[in-house]
Amino acid sequence: PEQLDRMAQGMVDLVNKTRSAMSIDDYHFDVDAHDEVAHQAAIESMVLLKNDDDILPVAANAKIAVIGEFARTPRYQGGGSSHITPTKMTSFLDTLAARGVDVAFAPGFTLDLEPADRTLEAEAVETAKNADVVLMFLGLPEAAESEGFDRETLDIPAKQVELLKAVAAENKNIVVVLSNGSVVSVAPGAGNAKGILESWLLG
């Protein structure tokens, strides 16, 4: 018991000594500067996997449809112990709006592992029909990957693949932007999209 008390007291002493250093009440930093570093890192980490017919870069006057909830609710971190609370976060749709780019948006699916929502799917297909270019934000929702379990497949959720095929039946000018923290199969995009951009977790 005495040895246990000594060991425990050592931990208590360490906590007391470091408590002030761990306080963030008086901690200040340049949020915008840090955000710019993260922004630049995100840009430089993307990998262009496919670009048939030079579909990228998108022409300035192109009519753009953006499909996929990831465009509005981006994944910027992994699951489990890596969770953080960001000081600033900007979605793809936020960025387009800030630059004055007008796009048609439809979420197409929900960020969970539930079956497809046919109403969302139909809305997305209709949104994509008359666009010059369709940017489809697909990938792995947080529920599909984490440090606490193994994945059983390399595929993105079936409802997203179904949506991609449905949109491709109406519009062939598709660029898939992938959002994932671990490897995924690009086979669905390879057959149904002219462009594939691997963006990982842009945090």
What are these regions (language model features)?
Residues 1, 13, 32, 36-203:
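C-terminal non-catalytic regions of proteins with extracellular/luminal or membrane-system context
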Residues 20-34:
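Flexible, acidic loop-helix segments that line cofactor/substrate-binding pockets
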Residues 1-21:
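Long, well-ordered, tryptophan-enriched scaffold segments
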